[in-house]
Amino acid sequence: MRRPSLALLALSSLPFGSARQPASFSIHQDLLAHPQFEVIFSDSYVFEADAFALLEAANKTPKPTPASDGAHDGSTTRTDLTSAIRESATANADTDNGDESIGGTSPLRETYELIAHPPMRYLCSIPIIAPPPALNKTATELAKAEEAREVTRAYNKGWELMRGLENQCLHFVSGWWSYQYCYGKSIVQYHAVPNPKGGPPLRDKNSQEYILGTSLPPSSHSQKGKQIEVPNNEQKQLSPPPNTELQAKDNQRYLVQRLDGGTICDLTGRPRTIEIQYHCNPALSGDRIGWIKEVTTCAYLMVIHTPRLCADVAFLPPKETKAHPITCRQIITSDEEALSFNQRRKNTIDSAAAAAAAVTTEDQKQGSESGSPEKLSYQGLTVAGIPIGARRILPSTHVLPLPRHLQQQRQEAQQGNLLEALTKAAFKADVFGDYGDDNNNNNNNHHPKAGKGRKAAGAGKGQSGQKEMKKMRISERDIDKLGLDQQTLDALREEIRAAGLDPDRNLNDEREAGGEIVWEFYADVSGDEDDGAVAEEGKEVFVWYEDEDEGGEPAEAGKDQKESKKGGNGEGSGSGSEEGSKEEYYRDEL
């Protein structure tokens, strides 16, 4: 188990030696952290008697060993324990480099420190690193000469490896533009059209193409600067391509080639130019263009990743610098505590194994459902306790809540107030249609058997025997707009039927000429004290009524439905008993 080394790096009083600085600057290197250390909390433990024995031997300071009833008998010798700790630290820190030293340096010996982290204590072994040998002037000059020879050798070897790209072309697509680069020739920018055969992108003959750069033929020069003509075979072996060099960045070398002679730029009046960089990428099986960018006006940069350069160790990516391990082991005072430690470790291992088995089972189940026997190797990324990208279904506790208006509609629907939910939602969305006379009555906007008298909405409140019935129509599009569905309307029919009414007479659905289904019903928008529905100022009351004979009293069905609206007075105040009288009803005031 690895943890940050903030607490233990305070041991700066130890005689650490300075390590060799890197050859070139890298933004990933901490220039002030040399040598580098990493704190590792081991899964093993050490008995208290052995821990103090190691501290005494390392510091050469006599310390009394505390006596404890359940202390270990000390049968393990100090030499064996020291060797075991050193071997474990080395194995945990460096398993890939074999015999190579960590960070380019080797530890001379180890010292021990006691770290108190209540209620636990740890014995930490800290390696002491040998300082690098001092370089004199002669050794520095020899090192520079050796480095220059290595650069020349890598430069020639690199271009020799890149000759395998001759007579090959690479393609790259970036948005509108496509690029074609033929090694040793030129790179062309053009707009591509789909290739029906599935091959490289085809050039659009109706658009213009641009040459970003052209390669010059390789040539060899005499000492006087005069060009010497040689056969092509010898020419390829003598010199690399012109306008090339070897560069290094982040401790990795790569080849650079500059091409000139491109299409004249309209903005600068000069030919287009491009710089090509060849980087070693051992993870690829073939050559590939990484990206192309226009760094300045009509000046481009292209990066090619190729495994060819990886054949030379000089172009390989730098190995990750590993820190020296500071290994800490928990101090145990008794055999009972050791048993408890081992049990906790076993439980941790079992829990991890069970979690891995559960993931494997889930992957197999998903693979069988999709018809693919492949298992998922990617376990996803856990963010705030939620696995992302691993085909996991979120539990209900992590599902985002519905918007407030949808929550209210769902609650009202679940409580059985379907009519109230429908009317409230309809008036909020302003989707109710107001359709004039009914076939059974000459009065506009009224239920044919609504009762004794009628009056306009908002004309008064609490007046008995006066009702305002509105014929409401909702289309399929309005249903979708309200967030309702056919199941909601079916439940509404059941509510009307439970109230002793006929849903086919109170909630009718018909298909219009355009093929759209429309639901229509009647609602009371005035209120009646006799029915227990009082129309307060600024309020509307909705009541279901059953058709009756002329002169009969309307029978209230279900609970009175209320809806808030803007306050307003109806303009039509004529008597509802007068046949043929027309009442005006303003929808904008609702």
Swiss-Prot record:
Recorded GO CC terms: endoplasmic reticulum lumen; endoplasmic reticulum membrane
- Specify the glycosylation sites in chain numbering: N136
Q: Bias regions of kind Basic residues — which residues? A: 446-455
Which positions bind a mannooligosaccharide derivative?
W176, W177, Q189, D266, R272, E294, Y300
Compositional bias (Basic and acidic residues) spans?
A: 556-568, 579-590
**UniProt topology in membrane:** Peripheral membrane protein
What span is annotated as the signal peptide, if there is one? Answer: 1-19
All disulfide bonds of the chain are: C169-C182, C265-C298, C280-C310
MRH domain boundaries: 167-312
- Supply the alphabetized keyword list: Disulfide bond, Endoplasmic reticulum, Glycoprotein, Lectin, Membrane, Signal
For the motif Prevents secretion from ER, what are the positions? Answer: 587-590
Q: Which residues form a coiled coil?
A: none
Entry function? Lectin involved in the quality control of the secretory pathway. As a member of the endoplasmic reticulum-associated degradation lumenal (ERAD-L) surveillance system, targets misfolded endoplasmic reticulum lumenal glycoproteins for degradation.
Entry similarity comment:
Belongs to the OS-9 family.
Q: What is this protein called?
A: Protein OS-9 homolog
Q: Which organism is it from?
A: Neurospora crassa (strain ATCC 24698 / 74-OR23-1A / CBS 708.71 / DSM 1257 / FGSC 987)
Question: What is the taxonomic lineage of the source species?
Answer: Eukaryota, Fungi, Dikarya, Ascomycota, Pezizomycotina
Gene for this chain = yos-9
